[in-house]
Amino acid sequence: MEPGNYATLDGAKDIEGLLGAGGGRNLVSHSSPLASHPAAPTLMPTVNYAPLDLPGSAEPPKQCHPCPGVPQGASPAPVPYGYFGGGYYSCRVSRSSLKPCAQTAALATYPSETPAPGEEYPSRPTEFAFYPGYPGPYQPMASYLDVSVVQTLGAPGEPRHDSLLPVDSYQPWALAGGWNSQMCCQGEQNPPGPFWKAAFAEPSVQHPPPDGCAFRRGRKKRIPYSKGQLRELEREYAANKFITKDKRRKISAATSLSERQITIWFQNRRVKEKKVLAKVKTSTTP
């Protein structure tokens, strides 16, 4: 044998003596080109398996079935070992090519770690889904599969999903009878017609109030005084323009009018006389 071969064997023996039998086997297994290392699966669900396979074992390395929802031609960015914590391998797929599959529930159960700022991929597209009524965009939370709820980035042929939060359209209140109509209870509407007929018609005759509803009436209808009542009031006014309490009680008993009605009539009668005198005065002066 040549001297170079002897030197190589002596160096190997020294290394084996320093590291021990176990260390030498591990070193040889790592340095040997024929050692079979488990390669990180490209597109598959998380699977736990042994980190190293001893060389020369008859059992072939474990192969995982690819996810049926991911196209075979896609090439995602590689993910380092231990990225999501534990001894599991995982893969991150672009959102547009990810479709719902039966393994979604199994993937969502595994815990995940929030990646550091340096480990975030710059080529990953940013996606925001805006919901009506919320000021900020939807932010995905940890420990869930990174799948958008509302599809915003996708192929043109794929169907778009409508908003999951229904928003009722604004409908203004419609008043059938206009603003002049008197609305008492729910469901009461005036019949169509000219507004002056609805305004001057008697509310109690046109629409009788239903049971359990207090009808709000406008101005009370004026009841004219009889000739006998007016004669008694005019006679007292001619005697005294300001009525006293005793006279008011006597007239109230004689005319069947309330004391308030008599007081108001005397006030109106004084105003009327004042207007008549002012009109006569303006007509006589040149």
UniProtKB/Swiss-Prot annotation:
Subcellular location: Nucleus
InterPro entries xref list: AP_axis_regulatory_Homeobox (IPR051003), HD (IPR001356), Homeobox_CS (IPR017970), Homeodomain-like_sf (IPR009057), HoxA13_N (IPR022067)
UniProt DNA-binding residue ranges: 218-277
The keyword Transcription regulation is assigned to this record: yes
Broad class of where this protein is predominantly found: nucleus
Any one GO biological process: regulation of growth
Tissue expr: Exhibits both spatial and temporal colinearity within the main body axis. At 12.5 dpc, is detected in hindgut, urogenital tract, spinal cord and tailbud. Not detected in secondary axes such as the limb and the genital tubercule.
Region of interest called Interaction with DNA, as start-end residue ranges on this chain: 219-248, 272-275
Matches recorded under Pfam families: Homeodomain (PF00046), HoxA13_N (PF12284)
CDD domains: homeodomain (cd00086)
Known partners and oligomeric status: Heterodimer with MEIS1 and MEIS2.
Similarity comment text for this entry: Belongs to the Abd-B homeobox family.
Name the UniProt record assigns to this protein: Homeobox protein Hox-B13
Protein source organism: Mus musculus
